[in-house]
Amino acid sequence: YDDAERFTFFSRAILEMLKHIDFKPDILNCNDWQTALVPVYYSIFYRGVPELSGIKTVFTIHNIQYQGKYGMELCSEILGLPNYSYNIVEYEGCVNFMKGAFETADKITTVSPTYASEILNPYFSHGLDPILWSKQYKLTGFLNGIDLDVYNPATDPALPENFSAESPDGKAVCKTALLEEMGLPDGQEPVMGIVTRLVSHKGGDLIRRVFNEMVGLGYKFVILGSGERQYEDVFREMAWKYPDRVSVRIGFIPDLAHRIYAGADIFHMPAPSPAGGGGPLGS
């Protein structure tokens, strides 16, 4: 409930810190609404400070749904912005942290070229497409990547047995071990792995509608994730309803995620519009 205060303080502290450390960055890369005020504050209060002049700001969008929207009273009570600058963060009668970053950052990036195009569409933009259309000249999508040293089944220490495309035998060992770890019986049925945040934009409603049907087709499911309580409860119920078919771990365990990527036959990405997610790349 106090996230606006927390991240306002954090954003201001980032810039104040630069006055007191022996390092001047060339670029400040700010991610999502939680640090969206950094380019706002820099443009208003810090660009003219001699020891901080010349720094460029880049704002990266991972999910445009979460924008940091609050009442306009935040401008005077919390943000400490001068009256003349309220229009920078105002959008549709609210303070919108992300909109402020769009206005003031030198560059706007996001996690894929496709997503950069999609968020110009009202269907995907969650209301911010008019602003982004006016900022197209500084909007670029860079495709997400993964660390191939970390996501490498031939060397991954989290796996019970390593394997590769040239030597794939360890894949079957990983599948058997995964089923045992998740409390499911071994068998020949295809195993579908899901590693995701359990929220609506990641496809929670979509998979809830078809889950019973998919279990009926003969799949086994191993699921790792956390998020909104309603979706966590759905998967808990499915694990109770199909104890030999569905196993769920609520939370995020990095090593288990690697074992799901390695042991599952199919990686399921239910999000209707995944923004260049790392899960499919990792699997």
What do the predicted segments below correspond to?
Residues 1-283:
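Catalytic cores of nucleotide-sugar-dependent glycosyltransferases that transfer UDP/GDP/TDP-activated
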